[in-house]
Amino acid sequence: MNTAAQCSRRLLLAVACLVVALAGQPARADDYLFNDSHFHLTNYIQRGTDIRDYLRIMGDKIGRSTLFGIPLQQTWSYENSGDYGPTYYLQSDAPLYYYSFTDAYIAKTYLSLSPKQRERFDPMITGFNPADMYAVDHIRRVLELFPGVFTGIGEFTIHKEFVSSKVAGDIASLTDPALDRILAFAGEVGLIALIHSDIDTPFAKADTPPVYLEQMKALLRRHPGTTIIWAHMGLGRVVHPVQAQAGSDTAQRNPNQLELVEAMIDDPALRHVYFDISWDEVAKYAVASPAIIDKVVAFMNAHSDRLLFGTDNVAPTSQEAHLKVFHMWDPVWRRLTPEASENIRKNNYVRLFDAAREKVRAWEKKNVPQRQPNDKS
């Protein structure tokens, strides 16, 4: 091989090594698009994106990201679907069951990264049953087995369209003391709690109070020492934003979705509660018409310190697909004040998750026995 060819080969090798190395480096603080407060690495059959592929998907567009799987496993029942193996909960009538191994998988995946790469992720514990009084024991065991890894719990589900009724065993409830134990322990440790609970039943009629709203507010008020993020602002695929009926002649018009959330934000007893605007279904509602966009922009500009953007993507395969939900919000991003936009896309994530990291590490230092060099357990 001549000298020129050798130099060319070395140059290509150096470039390839640089590309791999840069995939794990965070984007510069001033030029990435967002931090992702709501991301699933794996799906309903526990398959997903390799963490290094996800780093490449993040690239220089995403600064940091939560990291969790799906706490529920879809059963493949031959009696129900034959040779077809469902990968999503809508593809089968067979039940879902809690899959606790997801937490070990997420921890091992995170620990496979270099310390610099780990800085970009905030793993979350999800593999517990919120209707089980022993759920707290699971969370504690995960923290003891994997100290230095987890920042929060969730996304875990209480009420969810099409899902809640499929879960094997007891039905989760906002009034279950098991859930109070979970949130109280999260507050003790400093773990952020990301909770999915629909605000209402599917296809609710206009001018009717949301079925689960008062229970949710009561739960949140019972745990002022826990940082809680209400996923999707309580919305779902067929759990539509709460609406006041146009032209209603009722004596007092019921508030709409944004007014309900705004009232919660203004409630001094709920200062510890935040809302994520993740999921493409939520984005569809937010940009449904120019009039709705106007209201959403005004709401987000006024309350940007309590909102976080997240994708709610599950096991993405490309950067283009992963960024699609972010760009669905472009009509809103363009009209937000620079401060509001930065808060929702980036700053609130950093503020909340950095604080949680610090609190959880301090709790672990105090409560998790330090292994000695000869400890082979």
Labelled PLM ranges:
Residues 12-23:
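Bacterial N-terminal signal peptides
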Residues 32, 81-201, 205-208:
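Active-site gating/metal-coordination segments in enzymes
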Residues 40-42, 70-71, 126-130, 156-159, ...:
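Active-site beta-loop-alpha junctions enriched in small/polar residues
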Residues 35-39, 65-68, 121-125, 152-154, ...:
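Hydrophobic faces of well-ordered beta-strands that scaffold small-molecule active sites
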Residues 167-308:
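Catalytic pocket-lining loop regions of alpha/beta-barrel enzymes
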Residues 4, 28-37, 46, 50-65, ...:
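Mid-to-C-terminal alpha-helical segments outside catalytic/metal-binding sites
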Residues 2-13:
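Bacterial N-terminal signal peptides that target proteins for export
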Residues 29-108, 114:
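An N-terminally biased module of ancient metal coordination in phosphate/nucleic-acid-related enzymes
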